[in-house]
Swiss-Prot record:
Location in the cell: Cell membrane
Organism: Ricinus communis
NCBIfam families: A_tha_TIGR01569
Family: Belongs to the Casparian strip membrane proteins (CASP) family.
Regions that span the bilayer: 50-70, 97-117, 133-153, 183-203
Extracellular side: 71-96, 154-182
Glycosylated residues, chain numbering: N161
Protein name, per record: CASP-like protein 3A1
PANTHER family: CASP-LIKE PROTEIN 3A1, CASP-LIKE PROTEIN 4A4
Ranges per topology, Cytoplasmic: 1-49, 118-132, 204-214
Keywords recorded for this protein, A-Z: Cell membrane, Glycoprotein, Membrane, Transmembrane, Transmembrane helix
Major subcellular location class: membrane
Signal peptide span: none
Subunit comment: Homodimer and heterodimers.
Length: 214
């Protein structure tokens, strides 16, 4: 009898150890994904993040492209005199500011796009940790506000070019310089679209942070 009891205990100990191991795996399984990285978002959300980042890159590059090609020469009538006029984006500090901010946004978005696509292709979470989420959230916020200020400053100069100055002989410069003004207007429009896309990315990152506990 004593020998039989000893054999029973020897057999039961491994079973209880296996059961405890299974319980530990079951408890930790849903909380940890891929080596301790939390993944509150699914595959669709990761794909949406990459699409938004791609669109932001395209719109910011388009804003830069249209602005740097905005230049034209023509003539304008002031007090009956036909005077030659030449306009170029680099003549205005507001337009230079818009080009600088748009280029910075394009570089930031392209870098984040490459990182996100590499993670997506490896089937890893696009946002791997809270620290990474906070970092890109801060970057998106800063660039969104900078883009708003640049677009607003450029819009003021463009509006002055289109309306002229009241009570003076200064005309609507966009009539003889329509190519220049149209390029500037398109650039400003894409700058504001980039700002909206950055805001959408920031919202997605806030949702990620609210769902993540790690």
């Amino acid at each position: 009898m004593t020998n039989g009891q000893k054999i029973e205990v020897a057999v039961q100990l491994p079973e209880s150890k296996v059961a405890a191991t299974e319980n530990n795996e079951t408890m930790s399984g849903p909380l940890v994904v891929g080596g301790g990285v939390a993944k509150p978002f699914g595959r669709k959300a990761d794909v949406m993040h990459v699409i938004l980042r791609l669109l932001c890159t395209i719109t910011s590059v388009t804003a830069v492209s249209f602005m740097v090609t905005a230049h034209q020469s023509s003539t304008v009538s002031i007090y009956g005199f036909m005077l030659p006029v030449r306009s170029k984006w680099s003549f205005s500090h507001s337009f230079e500011y818009l080009v600088g901010v748009s280029a910075a946004v394009a570089a930031h978005s392209l870098l984040q796009l490459l990182i996100s696509m590499s993670r997506l292709l490896r089937k890893s979470p696009v946002i791997p940790s809270r620290s990474h989420a906070w970092l890109i959230f801060a970057g998106d916020q800063v660039f969104a506000y900078a883009m708003i200020s640049a677009g607003a400053a450029a819009s003021g100069v463009t509006n002055l070019n289109r309306t002229g100055i009241q009570h003076t002989a200064l005309p609507n410069f966009c009539k003889p310089l329509n190519y220049f003004c149209n390029h500037v207007a398109v650039s400003i429009a894409f700058a504001f679209i980039s700002c909206l896309l950055l805001a959408a990315l920031a919202v997605q990152e806030v949702i990620w942070l609210s769902k993540s506990k790690y």
